[in-house]
Curated annotation (Swiss-Prot):
Organism: Mus musculus
UniProt enzyme class: hydrolase
Residues annotated as catalytic: E352
Signal peptide per UniProt: 1-33
Domain Peptidase M12B: 217-411
Protein name in UniProt: ADAM DEC1
Any GO BP: proteolysis
Entry EC number(s): 3.4.24.-
Length: 467
């Protein structure tokens, strides 16, 4: 059951995101976007996989730790030559991309429900940076070649495989969209908030725990895909799932900046027909979804649900969320996901999630290091990977004034899908887990085996657990 109120409030604080119809123009694949004139349209590169150097005097080859059979190591390095310059990606496997109790529900043509617990999701999603390039970022999947995004020297790039192998030919494309950075119309000048009372939990935190402000926080995200979205993929659930996992990888890049780990804990696909009335009126669809969520998903462990719709809504509206609703049963949002690439979709998902976490829209001129703020009132052509000072203040206020303790609920170690030594989580069968050899600072924990060292002071496992 979701933390928070025990019944559905009759009124909810709803935050509208009013964005231009022109936004639809840029919902094409990034590779089709207008390219920066001074750069080559694309460059063909051949990534070279590099061995991970062992630090602290460790001579063991990494295959001893990861095993020869493991295709996707927890840490990898790739080298490419771009514009005559050597670039080395240093990547670490994304942790907890899926929650320990992840389920996937779909329906037969007769309406019969089928739920599976996915245990075989490829662990091929990575995050990291470019070696010796301060401020660089990389989010890349290695499932069938290298595919993803990275930033270098204030330029954004997409890399995609031309062959289904990580060391074959790849295309690297710089991208930006033609026209103004912000896309809007006259009706999208400011955020519209319904004149309804704010959702309240049973009590407020007068003296918030320091963990809420400084500690690691967790979000269990549940995705619902309507029938129109399902049809966009012609019923190919594998293709749809792979795309959404890439989006989730980008979502984590954004929320990692405020110490939040987002895990996908469930997905429901309305493959036979919609379970609510999805209509052009976004507000009405939102109300239908919120009531369906309360009646049908209350017993599934999560703390925010998003409906991704393949339909279009009136007046160019593309998203709606219940503001300040996190840790309540009304923590939901609806997003128009029709024909959006992963960058465009994650921009909307992160924005609406921000509203549920107490963040309001910020003016278009608000500055963020990446050039685009997550909570900007207008969508931008730039990947929004930063929260402004104002948004961080809003979030801190939410943590201080509301019962936001559900953000501290980490996945239960005994339910982790697949034990992985080096993920800093005490999995079943491990005596300790202090991370990779480069990360480990625990003198009693052996990072290669996740076993306690045979030293007199290292006998109590409970004293040497890193979580």
């Amino acid at each position: 059951m979701l933390p928070g109120t025990s019944r559905l409030p009759t009124e909810a604080s709803m935050s509208w995101v009013l964005l231009s119809v022109l936004w639809l123009i840029i919902q094409i694949q990034v590779i089709d976007a207008t390219l920066t004139p001074e750069l080559k349209p694309h460059e063909i590169v051949r990534p070279k996989k590099l061995p991970i150097s062992q630090k602290r005097g460790l001579e063991n080859n990494q295959t001893e730790r990861y095993g020869k059979e493991e295709k996707y190591a927890p840490e990898v390095q790739y080298q490419i030559i771009l514009n005559g310059e050597e670039i080395v990606f240093h990547l670490k496997r994304t942790k907890h991309l899926l929650g320990p109790d992840y389920t996937e529900t779909s329906y037969s043509p007769r309406g019969e429900e089928s739920t599976r617990h996915s245990q075989d999701v490829k662990p091929c999603y990575y995050e990291g940076h470019i070696q010796n390039a301060r401020g660089s970022l990389a989010r890349i999947s290695t499932c069938d070649g290298l595919r993803g995004y990275f930033t270098h020297r204030d330029q954004r790039y997409q890399i995609k495989p031309l062959q289904s192998t990580d060391e074959g030919e790849h295309a690297v494309l710089p991208y930006s969209w033609k026209g103004q950075d912000t896309v809007h119309d006259k009706d999208a000048e400011k955020q519209v908030v319904r004149k309804r009372s704010h959702l309240r939990t049973s009590r407020s935190l007068k003296n918030p725990n320091e963990d809420l402000l400084q500690g690691q926080k967790y979000i269990g995200l549940f995705l619902v895909l309507d029938n129109a979205y399902y049809k966009l993929y012609n019923g190919n659930v594998t293709q749809m799932r792979t795309f959404l996992f890439k989006v989730l990888n980008l979502l984590n890049m954004i929320y990692k900046t405020i110490n939040i780990q987002v895990s996908l804990v469930g997905m429901e696909i309305w493959s036979d027909q919609d379970k609510i009335k999805v209509e052009p009126n976004l507000g009405a669809t939102f109300t239908h979804f919120m009531r369906w969520h309360y009646s049908n998903l209350g017993k599934r462990i999560h703390n925010h649900a998003q409906l991704l719709s393949g339909a279009s809504f009136r007046h160019g509206r593309v998203g709606m969320a219940a503001g300040n609703s996190f840790c309540t049963t009304s923590s939901v949002s609806v997003i128009e996901a029709k024909k959006k690439n992963n960058v465009a979709l994650v921009a909307l998902m992160s924005h609406e999630l921000g509203h549920a976490l107490g963040m309001k829209d910020v003016p278009y001129y608000t500055k963020c290091p990446s050039g685009s703020c997550v909570m900007n009132q207008y969508l931008s052509s730039k990947f929004p990977k930063d929260f402004s000072t104002v948004s961080r203040s809003h979030f801190q206020g939410f943590l201080s004034s509301r019962n936001a303790r559900c953000l501290l609920l980490a996945p239960d170690p005994k339910n982790i899908i697949k034990p992985t030594c080096g993920n800093q989580v005490l999995d079943v069968g491990e005596e300790c887990d202090c991370g990779s050899p480069e990360e480990c600072t625990n003198l009693c924990c052996e990072p290669l085996t996740c076993r306690l060292k045979s030293q007199p002071d290292c006998s109590e496992a409970s004293n040497h657990i890193t979580e």
